[in-house]
């Protein structure tokens, strides 16, 4: 919630009071909709919490607007003591172009760990060869494939649904096409569960 420092302070107070919290996740909406100075304020305050070790940022914005990865943003991540992980949301190899690759190179240069999560979508990427090309292009860009999600059964998205049996067939074929470290974990998020449910890894 960009600009809402009162809410942020409540979250900071909670994190500071719970020493078991080692990682903070910036997630959606999209955290990179916030301005660099807003992110800087929040990260500087997180740095002051001694038990925090890692910052994870989930975002799709660099795929749509690669120019969002500004020099100021990269400097902010370079200077933080927190180990920073960025998880991009890319579903098809055609989403990766040279402008996006350059933005990721800037993040690599400041030691940001880059991961990707995709959603398996009927008619978009429900083909092992497409997923292999996606993994190859991600890795060439410095991004490690992390998760391949089975689509949540939500209203209005049924035309993208793939059966679990089909998904497993696609996944097994993908495993035969590329190196193990380029095969993302096949998973589903189930409401009420604290962690993703893994179908294969």
Language-model features, listed with the residues they occupy:
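Iron-sulfur (Fe-S) cluster-binding segments and ferredoxin-like electron-carrier domains
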Residues: 1-2
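Conserved AdoMet/S-adenosylmethionine-binding subsite of the radical SAM
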Residues: 7-23, 32-178
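C-terminal accessory regions of radical SAM enzymes
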Residues: 168-201
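Short, internal active-site loops enriched in acidic
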Residues: 31-32, 62, 192-197
């Amino acid at each position: 919630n960009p600009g809402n420092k009162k809410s942020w302070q409540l979250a900071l107070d909670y994190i500071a009071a719970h020493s078991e919290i080692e990682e903070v996740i910036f997630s959606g909406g999209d955290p990179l909709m916030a301005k660099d100075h807003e992110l800087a304020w929040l990260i500087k305050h997180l740095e002051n919490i001694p038990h925090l070790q890692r910052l994870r940022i989930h975002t799709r914005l660099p795929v749509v607007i690669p120019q969002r990865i500004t020099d100021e943003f990269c400097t902010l991540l370079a200077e933080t003591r927190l180990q920073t992980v960025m998880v991009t949301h890319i579903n098809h190899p055609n989403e990766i172009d040279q402008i996006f690759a350059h933005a990721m190179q800037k993040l690599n240069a400041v030691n940001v760990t880059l991961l990707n999560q995709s959603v398996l979508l009927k008619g978009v990427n429900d083909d092992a060869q497409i997923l292999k090309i996606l993994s190859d292009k991600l890795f060439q860009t410095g991004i490690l494939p992390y998760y391949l999600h089975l689509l949540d059964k939500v209203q209005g998205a049924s035309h993208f649904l793939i059966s679990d049996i089909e998904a497993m067939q696609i996944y097994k074929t993908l495993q035969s096409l590329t190196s193990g470290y380029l095969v993302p974990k096949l998973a589903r998020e189930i409401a009420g569960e604290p962690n993703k449910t893994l179908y294969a890894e």
